[in-house]
From Swiss-Prot:
[4Fe-4S] cluster binds at residues 285, 291, 298, 316. Belongs to the ABC transporter superfamily. Its EC number is 7.4.2.9. SUPFAM superfamilies: P-loop containing nucleoside triphosphate hydrolases (SSF52540). The keyword Nucleotide-binding applies. This is Dipeptide transport ATP-binding protein DppD. It comes from Caldanaerobacter subterraneus subsp. tengcongensis (strain DSM 15242 / JCM 11007 / NBRC 100824 / MB4). One of its GO terms (biological process) is protein transport. It catalyses: a dipeptide(out) + ATP + H2O = a dipeptide(in) + ADP + phosphate + H(+). GO terms for cellular component: plasma membrane. It is a peripheral membrane protein.
Length: 326
């Protein structure tokens, strides 16, 4: 598979009254065409910042300090707004976090589809709009006759999430980015959304990138997993290898903390300590205050981004020292 998006040394911050939040610090990864990539990490680790920086949709206090995001060889970060508008939604579509709340409660679903089309300069007749919207709603297992003339308050959380996925697919993008697509949903609805995304990926041969704090969700859906900690990318590998042989101590901690119905509770171990403040992150490796393998160098120097065998990448001094996890 070829690379459809290449992220190089992406750095983004938020300017707040207390100082500068260092939310994405030197992120580099390749997204393969027709693949599913999960960006995984604890809450407030910088996951959403990465995709918002990639798509230039950061809030007003967000700043991109450096880096490149190459899509089909062109840097999205240096494009003028009018150039980006030709790509957004038509080629790269984003379903943001807490998207269920982004539907206007005073507008019917069909009006949301109409607004999306008009905002991107697409000229469809009313009958074409109904036909296209109905097609996308059926793709996400919704009945267009019942949903198109409904207001958001008449829909369940899972239905609203599927409406937003249908809206994102309306102009047939080649890349679909979803920020926490299963958060705030009950377990059964989460399972339905995951299954739906699997079907859409297979049907449309689309590239999916999704953010989640739940590594078990990544296991269900992703081909590759990018593990984020404290605004840093600490591991990037195939999903199979991430679970078979986690390279970074943080990745191992995430996997060991997974709760399952049939789990041996004696083997379920939470990661000790708390995530770092991105306002005043620890020196060196940001995970070192919580890491049982921490060495003196971990407190002083940020580890290098190392490529190991195959697809494996890791940022950990253990590998620089020739002492991998066992």
């Amino acid at each position: 598979m070829s690379i459809i998006i290449r992220v190089e040394d992406l750095r983004a911050v938020y300017l707040v009254r207390e100082g500068t939040i260092k939310a994405a610090d030197g992120i580099s990864l390749d997204i393969l065409e027709n693949s599913v990539t999960a960006i995984v990490g604890e809450s407030a680790s910088g996951k959403s910042t990465i995709i918002e920086a990639m798509t230039k949709t950061l809030p007003p206090n967000g700043r991109i300090l450096s880096g490149r995001v190459l899509y089909k060889g062109k840097d999205l970060l240096t494009m003028r707004e009018e150039e980006l508008r030709k790509i957004r939604w038509k080629e790269i579509a984003l379903v943001p976090q807490a998207a269920q709340q982004s539907l206007n409660p005073t507008m019917k679903v069909i009006e949301h589809f109409k607004d999306t089309v008009e905002a991107h300069g697409v000229r469809w007749s009313h009958s074409e709009l109904i036909e296209k919207a109905s097609e996308k709603l059926r793709m996400v297992r919704l009945n267009p006759e019942a949903v198109l003339n409904s207001y958001p308050l008449q829909l369940s959380g899972g239905m609203k999430q599927r409406v937003l996925i249908a809206l994102a697919l309306l102009l047939d993008p080649v890349v679909l980015i979803l920020d926490e697509p299963t958060s705030a949903l009950d377990v059964l609805t989460q399972a339905h959304i995951i299954q739906l995304l699997k079907e859409l990926k297979k049907m449309l041969k689309i590239t999916l990138i999704f953010v989640t704090h739940d590594i078990a969700v990544a296991a269900e859906l992703a081909d590759k997993v990018a593990v984020i900690y404290g605004g840093n990318l600490v591991e990037y590998n195939s999903t199979f290898q991430i679970f078979k042989n986690p390279l970074h101590p943080y990745t191992r901690g995430l996997i060991n903390s997974i709760m399952a119905v049939n789990a041996d509770m004696s083997k379920v171990k939470p990661i000790p300590g708390d995530p770092p403040s991105l306002l005043n992150p620890p020196s060196g490796c940001r995970f070192h205050p919580r890491c049982e393998y921490a060495m003196e160098i971990c407190k002083k120097e940020k580890p290098k981004w190392i490529r190991l065998d195959g697809e494996a990448h890791v940022a950990c001094h253990l590998y620089e020292e020739g002492r991998p996890l066992k």
